[in-house]
UniProtKB/Swiss-Prot annotation:
It comes from the Bacteria. InterPro entries: Dimethylallyltransferase, IPT, P-loop_NTPase. It catalyses: adenosine(37) in tRNA + dimethylallyl diphosphate = N(6)-dimethylallyladenosine(37) in tRNA + diphosphate. One of its GO terms (molecular function) is ATP binding. The keyword Transmembrane helix does not apply. This is tRNA dimethylallyltransferase. Substrate binds at residues 10-15. The keyword ATP-binding applies. It comes from Helicobacter hepaticus (strain ATCC 51449 / 3B1). Belongs to the IPP transferase family.
Amino acid sequence: MKIIAVLGSSGSGKSALAHRIAMEQNCKIFSLDSLSIYKYLDIASAKPTLLEQSQVCYYALNILEPHQKSNVMIFKDLLLQSIEDIKNNSPHTPLLIVGGSSFFLKSIMEGLSPMPPLEEHEEWVKSLGNISMQYAQLTQIDKTYAQSLSPTDTYRICKALALFKATNTPPSIYFATHKKESLGYDIEIFCLECERDELRERIAKRTKAMIQKGIVEEVQNVLEAYGAQAPALNAIGAKECVNFLQGKVATLQQLEEQIFFHTCQLAKRQRTFNRTQFAQITHLKEKALEAQLIQQIHNNIL
C-alpha cells in the first residue's frame, strides 16, 4: 500500500494540490490538521468544503467536539483505522497524508510509547506555576529526563509532569520500560515549498476570505456552546476571534491583522520544522511536486 505525506506551511496550497491529485489519481486523503479534526470550525480550519468531501474520501475530519483535547495518539489511531479501511476495501488506493501538523507525523513515524490518560492531571501541572517552575519541578523528579528537554519545551515538560503524576514513575524509567510502538508502514514525505513573499500574500488573501465567510460568527457559536476554555478555540484564527468577541481586539481590521501575523509566525515555524526534523524529505515547488507525486502514484500501480 502506498502512503505519501504532503506537508507544507499553513497557506502554502498543499491541501488544494493534494485534493486535485486525489481526484485525478483516485487517492484518499488523511487530514493531518490539528483544527480540522474538530467539528463546527469549518472556516477557521480551512476545511475541505462539502463538495470537496463528496469528491474525495477524507479521513480525520470532524472527529472531536470542541471541548475535547486533541493529541498525537488520537491521530495515530485514526491513521491506522484509515489504513485498515483502505486495505480492506480498496487495497490499491494510495493514501495521501496532508496537513501542517508535521510534529504529529514525526512522532507517529518515530513510534509512540503507550500512555495512560493524562488530562485529569493537567490542573496539577498548572498549579506548579510558570514553565520555569514546572521545569524545576521536573528536574527534581527526573534530572536525566529534564536535561534531555529544552527548558522552554512547554508541551513535553507538561506531558512529563502529568505522566509522573499519573504513574508515580519518573518519565525516563517509564519510557525505558514502555518501548515505542512503530507505525509499521513506510511513508514517503514531500514538502510543498513556497517563496516567502508569495506565502505571505496567500496567507493575507486567505485571512481576508475567512473574515468575509464568517469566521467570527462561527467562533461565536462555538464560544457560546463550549466556553472560552475549549481546546479547539486555542488555534490561530479561533483565539483571535475569541479576543475580538470579548472586546480585547477593537476592530475587524485589527482582527484580520492579528490572524495574518500569527499565521505567518506559524508558517515560519512549520517551515523550519519541515526542513530540520525529518531524515528523509523531498522539498519541491508546486509544479515539480505535482509531477513527482503523480509519478510516485503511477509507480505504485505498475
